[in-house]
Amino acid sequence: MISDESDRFNPRDPKPADAGKPSKSAKRREARKLATQALYQWHMAKHSLNEVEAQFRVDNDFSDVDGAYFREILHGVPAKKVEIDEALKPCLDTPLEELDPVELSVLRLSAWEFMMRADVPYRVVINEGVELAKVFGATDGHKFVNGVLDKLAPRLREAEVRANKR
């Protein structure tokens, strides 16, 4: 039998074109991180969204970031702020105004994803929110965020949550 040498692995061959490039989910994770920081800045400094976005695009390397998703979050969360806050209130034991601004930014981003991005599974939304709170929030902020998002998911994604509990 004749073997086909061309099908064998050759360590001297160049890597595939996409080797070492971040995946779509990794780029979205980076977009969420930057969006959390940008939403915090928008909330605290009261700059316009366009100013915040421009500053973030100048100050950060977007090569490993889903820039379109960053922009969608950054402009989408404030556009839905009233609806997001109304959805969050029944899941909180504390008034919104008393929440840590970082955790509030994470909760708003996650609530926006629940509402506007049905293509992102609810468990991914919760996990990403918890991870953002671990990176940017207070010591146990991720536990608080997890608890709120666990209450919020069935309110905003009832059918999906029910289907996943079977």
UniProtKB/Swiss-Prot annotation:
InterPro entries: NusB-like_sf, NusB_fam, NusB_RsmB_TIM44. The keyword Transcription regulation applies. Keywords: RNA-binding, Transcription, Transcription antitermination, Transcription regulation. GO terms for molecular function: RNA binding. Residues 1-18 have a biased composition (Basic and acidic residues). Pfam families: NusB. Involved in transcription antitermination. Required for transcription of ribosomal RNA (rRNA) genes. Binds specifically to the boxA antiterminator sequence of the ribosomal RNA (rrn) operons. PANTHER family: ANTITERMINATION NUSB DOMAIN-CONTAINING PROTEIN, N UTILIZATION SUBSTANCE PROTEIN B-RELATED. HAMAP family: NusB (MF_00073). Belongs to the NusB family. This is Transcription antitermination protein NusB. It comes from Pseudomonas entomophila (strain L48). The gene is nusB.
